[in-house]
C-alpha cells in the first residue's frame, strides 16, 4: 500500500482510488461506532476522502496513512455527533443491501454479532474495541489515533470486555430460566 500512497502523493488518481477501495469498509465500521445514520456515514467518508486527497502530499510518513485517515474520520464523526446527535445513540442494524454487496455472508454474520455485543457500550469503549480487535491496532497506536493516554485505552478495553462478559452472562441466565 505504501507504493500506492507514494503514487497518490505524486498525483496518481487511480492509485488514490485503489487505496480508498482497500480501506473503505474499515472506515465505515469505525464511523458506525459513533454515527447511526448510513447516509451521514457515507457523507463523512466522502468528506474524509476529499480532505485526504487535498492534503495527501503533506503526509510525511506513508506507512502512517491509514492512521492519519482514521484520525480525520474520527474528528469528522465527533463534529457531526456534537452538531446533530446530542443524545446517546445505539448502533442501528446495517443497511444490509449495501453491506451484503461488499462482504461475504460469514463476514456479515461475524460483524453483526460483534456489533450486537457492543451496541450498548459507551462510544469510547466501542471505538477502542473496533480499533483493537477489528483493525488489530496496538494500545500504543490507538492512543496516538485518539489522542488519549495508553492507560486510558487499556481502561476502556477492560471496561468494555467486562460489560460484554456481564451482558453475555445475563443472557445465559435468561436462557436457563426459559429452559
Residue ranges of each PLM-predicted region?
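Sigma70-family region 2
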Residues: 9, 49-64, 84-85
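Residues within the DNA-recognition helix of helix-turn-helix
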Residues: 23, 156-159, 163
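Internal acidic/polar
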Residues: 79, 87-112, 116, 138
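Short, charged helix-capping/linker segments at alpha-helix termini
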Residues: 9-18, 28-47, 145, 150, ...
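Short helix-capping/turn signature of helix-turn-helix
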Residues: 22-25, 33-34, 130-137
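Arg/Lys-rich amphipathic alpha helix in sigma70-family domain 2
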Residues: 57-60, 71-91, 159
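C-terminal edge and immediately downstream basic/flexible tail or linker adjoining helix-turn-helix-like DNA-binding
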Residues: 3, 7, 144-147, 161-179
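Helix-turn-helix DNA-binding module
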Residues: 116-127, 135-152, 163-166
Amino acid at each position: 500500500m505504501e507504493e500506492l500512497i507514494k503514487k497518490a502523493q505524486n498525483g496518481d488518481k487511480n492509485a488514490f482510488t485503489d487505496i480508498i477501495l482497500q480501506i473503505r469498509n474499515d472506515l465505515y465500521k469505525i464511523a458506525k461506532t459513533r454515527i447511526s445514520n448510513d447516509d451521514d456515514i457515507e457523507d463523512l467518508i466522502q468528506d474524509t476522502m476529499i480532505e485526504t486527497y487535498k492534503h495527501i502530499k503533506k503526509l510525511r510518513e506513508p506507512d502512517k496513512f491509514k492512521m492519519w485517515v482514521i484520525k480525520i474520520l474520527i474528528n469528522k464523526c465527533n463534529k457531526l455527533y456534537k452538531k446533530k446527535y446530542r443524545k446517546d445513540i445505539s448502533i442501528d442494524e446495517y443497511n444490509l443491501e449495501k453491506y451484503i454487496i461488499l462482504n461475504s455472508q460469514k463476514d456479515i454474520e461475524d460483524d453483526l454479532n460483534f456489533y450486537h455485543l457492543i451496541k450498548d457500550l459507551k462510544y469510547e469503549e466501542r471505538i477502542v474495541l473496533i480499533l483493537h480487535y477489528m483493525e488489530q491496532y496496538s494500545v500504543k497506536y490507538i492512543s496516538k489515533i485518539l489522542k488519549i493516554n495508553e492507560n486510558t485505552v487499556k481502561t476502556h478495553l477492560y471496561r468494555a470486555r467486562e460489560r460484554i462478559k456481564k451482558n453475555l452472562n445475563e443472557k445465559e441466565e435468561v436462557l436457563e430460566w426459559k429452559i
